[in-house]
Amino acid sequence: YFREHFLIPVAAAAIIIALVTFLAVRFISPDARPALYAAVVDDALTTSEATNLQNELEDKLGVSVIIDDYFDMDKDGLTKLQTMLSSKQIDVIIAPHKIFKQLAGYGYLTNLELTVSKSDNTKLDDATVQLKGFSDADDDGIDSSGTGKGASKSYGLKLSDATGWTSIADSDHSALIGIATGTKNTGTAQRFIDWLYR
């Protein structure tokens, strides 16, 4: 009698309860984010070299690292970057000078004065690049944008001075690096920068 009348509903209920429990646990405890997420914009590094750098950093720093080189500004790279920055997933941005200047103007990078001053690495002083940031002044007109109208600050570092970067064969030696606005992993980002400028 049980098999004929109750087996299918009980089995279906058990499957539904298991599925709901699995989904609830999955949403409550998402995957741990990496200790360092570096966004490499517009082919400043090839995919194979990004993978090699990621593996080397994980060994050297002893933390989980993602070097994401899928930020093509001619396609959907800016949208992806904005989405990930708004959810505070990106720690470091590496981009060609022209794109980096644009990103600093949007307000996507932090002032590196504290990073440089906390580091014992003297190479960082010479590598610092001053760029105009974002201005959110109240006196801006309704139709004006604050992009690139902020004060010039140390938003980037020249990677041409970084031995860890220039030793990579296919890297863009004119690229800049900076720490993303809102990162929760500033310490790891600083360790990564110090490692590049070793």
Residues covered by each model-derived region:
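Early extracytoplasmic/lumenal segment of secretory-pathway proteins
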Residues: 31-97
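Extracytoplasmic "Venus flytrap"/periplasmic binding protein-like
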Residues: 77-149
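Long, glycine/tryptophan/cysteine-rich extracytoplasmic
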Residues: 153-169, 174
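Short boundary motifs at domain starts and secondary-structure transition points
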Residues: 24-31, 165-169
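Hydrophobic membrane-insertion alpha-helices, especially the h-region
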Residues: 5-27
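A bilobed periplasmic-binding-protein/Venus flytrap-type ligand-binding module shared by bacterial periplasmic
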Residues: 171-185
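Short amphipathic alpha-helical coupling segments at ligand-binding clamshell hinges
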Residues: 184-195
